[in-house]
Amino acid sequence: MMDPRQETCGDIVSTRKRRLEELYYVSLHPRYPQGLDAKQKLKQFQDQFDLTQNRLFDENKLPKAVEEPKPVPTLQTSTPDAGSSPELKRRRTSSIAQLSPTFSRTSLKTNEQQLQEMLLFLVPSNIPEPTTETKSLAELYYTTQTLPLSKLIPSAHKTLTTDSYHLALLEGKLAVAHARIEELKRAGKWGPRQPKRFQDPIRRKTHWDHVLDEMEWMSTDFREERKFKQAMACEIAFSVLEYHKYGKEACCVKTKPIKFLPEEINESEDTESKMDIDTSMPPPSINPVEVTNISAADSVTVVDYDTLLSQPRTLSSTEESEDKPEEPSTDSEEVVGGEVPKRPAAPKLPESSPFKLYASVDKLDPLSKALFDNLPVTTPPGSAVNALQVPYSDPLDNSKLAPVTHLLAAPPEQDDWWSVCLEDSPADEDPLPLRSNTRSTLFNSETMRRHVVIKAPQPPQTKYLDFRTPTMWLLADDSQLLRLVKEYSYNWDIVSAHMLPQKTYGFTANIERRTSWQCFERWFQLNPTFSLTDLRGPYAQAAQQWMAAAAKAQAQSKRRISPLGVSNESIQRGHRKLRWASMFDGIRKSMRKRETTPRPNPQPPRKSQLSESNKKDIASPLDLCKMKFEQDKNLAKAYAQQRMMPGQMPGQMPPVPSNIPANRQFPGQRPPPPQTAAQIQAHTQAQARAAAAASGHMQQRMAGVGMNRMPGQMNDQHQMMQFDRQRQLMEQQKMLQQQQQQQFMRTQGQVPPQPGQVQGQVNQNVQGAQVAAGQAGMAQRPAGQIPQGQMPAQQGQVPPGQAGNQAQMMRPNMRMRPGGPQAAAPNEHLNALIRQLQNQNPALSLEAATKLAHVQVQRFVQKQQRVARQAQGQTPPQGQMRPGQPQGQPSPQMRSGSSTPMNMQSPQLMNVQLQQQQQQRSASPGQSPAQQHAMLMRMNQQQQQQQQQQQNQGQTQGQNQGQGPSE
């Protein structure tokens, strides 16, 4: 069963295609009087002789006489052979009946008028036929614009073909052509007549034209040969069936039995007597051993053809009866009355059967002969004498007028290029006998209709009852529903399938839906005498409950819920066509109502906890990828440098690469805010706990994994852990130093300096230390040697005793001129030290490296000052105040002693210890990576315990110092 959507869309496409063809031909001949006259004449002829209504032609009005009628040939008689088979007799009898002169009313009337006139039309398909309904270009353009195929095709189901898409493109071309024509009309450049078509020069047939002709001929030849082979196969199948049914004696050709000659041939007997045809003589018995001795030359049977030709002609071959038409016999009663065994007749082939292997012109009636003589004969290409000199002619090029525009091309030609406009009357053919009862008793028996059971379909859910849209039923819909219900015996699914709207265009409105339940509900409204208690089936109780709920809801609601019957008087004009417009109108009303209805107060948007500065500093994924790449690159460089470090001395520092910028900063990175002492202490404790937990987790993991990991991976993990541990130790040392310094200053009654003040003081110390170191170096250089980057005016030597005082005197000047040449040198040394720390520890951040560099510079300055005082012998006691020092401020030695514990390790010493540990691990190749990792973890735990003890000792010392002045 074809899908209704598919059938509907196919009808739309074919109708639209036909209209476009009409537009093409109308545009081809817009005001051509001869074309209009030809159309009118052809239309008048079709109205007079309606071939679709099977009307006969009026021979008196036929325009032309073809030829005079030929006399009917007389039928010759012949005596049948008594020895023929029963099957041949039956065939002969049937052929006699077929060859009996049978004349229809048309043929008799034609013979009486002697075929004075005859009508035969061979119409090419490219000539337009008159249309029953012609539309103008403007109307067709309006139709294609209001409902174009380009919008209908995407919503179609299972009907998307190439022809449909081509038709949609053709509609677009039509719109362009119409717009151009209207533009020319407004400009006054569109004339009522078209210019004469340009005649192209005559061209000869090319090789491609000959190939196309051969292709057409081969197609026809193969098609006809296939038909002939099918007919031959059918005849062979019938012959095999007769052979198995009637046997060899009735179906095979009777031949004379083989007569074998003796060894000695009597030539006298052979010359005297002729060979006699005796079918009753049995074959002589011959010894098989003797037969083998007969030569091939003597085994040939001598046949006298003159004797055979002189005998009376008989039908001894089935091929003769088929190839040559048999003549009727006058003694047909003898043949029919003979003793013929009753056998079922073979399948009779009608005269118009395609399996007829021969056709005789003598069997045709005069009208058929006249038509046969006038039919065109198909000949192979190139059969003419001068086929190459024949000019090529295209029937489409012979048109006198050109198309309106190149956008509208001619429609493709059909396969049946010639259409014969002559049909036989159906009165000449005997109608087939109809059965008395053409309808099946499966659905039409009275007993079944009396005992039919009405089953209810599945009802919808009752919770959607309040939102239901009523369906509209016209009078035609009600009558069709009642007819389908009676015809299909209350099969609601089939009734629903037949009640679906024919033209849906991919959308069905709610008022046009015809589901199984809606059909049953409307049928129940049309039959008020039917009781719901008579329903049967699994959904009978649910249907009763739904009907009761629907009646109750309809009584309480003002809106229509049940189906609505509409009469013809109440239908508005163009009701079905305006349903889409009403649907869009309803959509617009609902949108307008939604806009006008007051909306509830929206909740205030939640403010993000991130400030604007934090949002700006958030790194993007690209920035994070770059940071990750830089970090991996630095780690790789550090690993490469460590592999090259065993050749250096233990205290020697690796060279500083010059390609790394001094002020390197990652994108999105900002300096951390200042932290209080409590935050620093909490951060230090959290890092210690995290390190202890990580070490414990790593021990458990290594204990579980064992020797499964590769040694290279274990070494990389050891190095990563060493760098992390070293960075944590440096940060903890810095935190402890700051805490002890702040605690000591609180005990002395001083305000602890801010991070900015501490940084400025450190810079001053670094600058003073660099100046003192430079002056000390100048004292040791020989005369005339100037260091790089120093002016000759600065070559004055300073005594060692005045180095510290001069450094203290130059600090205010350096603070006042931070951008001078003397301040640039310490900054360069400081940046070089920061780069060196970052190369040694790639995981170390820029801020931590800067802090470590300041600490090292401060220690270096203190050491230089201590060495200078010892050299001068002016080392003051610990509690003595220097001149110029404010009261209540501790001396530098006291500050350095209180801020730097005795057991605090420097980064250089820690690097030396790490190198020694690596050498110890490399010197013990017998240990596995897991054992080395466990040993390293134990060493880390011991260092953590020592640091904890140092912190406790520092806290007790600070408490004792705080209690001393108070006492």
Curated annotation (Swiss-Prot):
List UniProt keywords, sorted A-Z. Activator, Chromatin regulator, DNA damage, DNA repair, Nucleus, Transcription, Transcription regulation
- Composition bias of kind Low complexity appears in 864-932, 940-967
Compartmental location: Nucleus
Gene Ontology biological process terms in this record: chromatin organization; DNA repair
Q: Which one Pfam family would you cite for this protein?
A: Myb_DNA-bind_6
Keyword tRNA processing set for record: no
Q: Per the record, GO CC terms?
A: NuA4 histone acetyltransferase complex; nucleus
Composition skew (Basic and acidic residues), residue ranges: 60-70
Q: Which SMART domains match?
A: HSA, SANT
Spans of biased composition, class Acidic residues?
A: 319-336
Domain Myb-like spans what residues? 469-529
Please list the coiled coil stretches.
none
Provide the HSA domain boundaries. 195-276
SUPFAM superfamilies, sorted = Homeodomain-like
Indicate yes or no for the key word Transcription: yes
Q: Tell me, what is one Gene Ontology molecular-function annotation carried by this entry?
A: chromatin binding
Please list where the region (Disordered) is annotated: 60-97, 264-283, 311-352, 587-621, 653-680, 774-806, 864-967
Q: Spell out the subunit comment.
A: Component of the NuA4 histone acetyltransferase complex.
The task this protein performs is described as: Component of the NuA4 histone acetyltransferase complex which is involved in transcriptional activation of selected genes principally by acetylation of nucleosomal histone H4 and H2A. The NuA4 complex is also involved in DNA repair.
Family under the similarity heading: Belongs to the EAF1 family.
Mind telling me which PANTHER family this protein's record contains? E1A-BINDING PROTEIN P400, E1A-BINDING PROTEIN P400-RELATED
Name of the protein in its database record:
Chromatin modification-related protein EAF1
| Species of provenance | Yarrowia lipolytica (strain CLIB 122 / E 150) (Yeast)
